[in-house]
A protein has these predicted regions:
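Acidic, PIN/NYN-like endoribonuclease modules and their adjacent C-terminal/linker elements
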Residues: 1-3, 85, 109-139
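Short glycine/serine- and small hydrophobic-enriched flexible loop segments
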Residues: 49-56, 113
């Protein structure tokens, strides 16, 4: 496997869940072994939003969030951001309609389809749409 598309639903579990869900841990191990993670530009905003929500709910401390953001910058340095927001917005609308997804989730599906890479996600709707779109799920 040359790489995979990393959905924020998986990556957030690396910072929020202890113990980490089995699937999220398995995906993290792929990443730590040097398998390339591909993320859309939207991923960075989803990650920071998930962390600030966890801070507001007292799941993480401010220090935890600050450390997680530094870790995310390291992840992002190894990730390949191959799309622009404008291009994503155009395509995601059609994909969202076709597969009854949010526009945000459609961006991940489109990226996986375009790059011909498996998709790592914990989102049920996205997991259900992937095979119908011809996208392999990372197991």
């Amino acid at each position: 496997m040359s790489g995979f598309v990393l959905d924020a639903s998986v990556a957030l579990r690396w910072f929020l869940d202890h113990p980490m869900p089995v699937y999220a841990n398995r995906v993290k191990q792929f990443f730590l072994k040097g398998i390339r993670a591909v993320v859309p530009a939207l991923w960075h905003l989803e990650m920071s939003n998930g962390l600030v929500v966890a801070e507001r709910r007292s799941i993480l401390t401010t220090a935890d969030v600050d450390q997680a953001m530094m870790d995310i910058e390291q992840i992002a340095a190894q990730a390949l951001d191959t799309d622009s927001i404008v291009d994503s917005a155009r395509q995601s609308l059609a994909t969202a309609r076709a597969f009854q997804l949010s526009a945000y989730d459609a961006v991940y599906l489109d990226l996986a389809r375009r790059e011909r890479l498996p998709l790592a996600t914990l989102d049920d709707r996205l997991r259900n749409a992937a095979p119908r779109a011809g996208v392999e799920l990372l197991r």
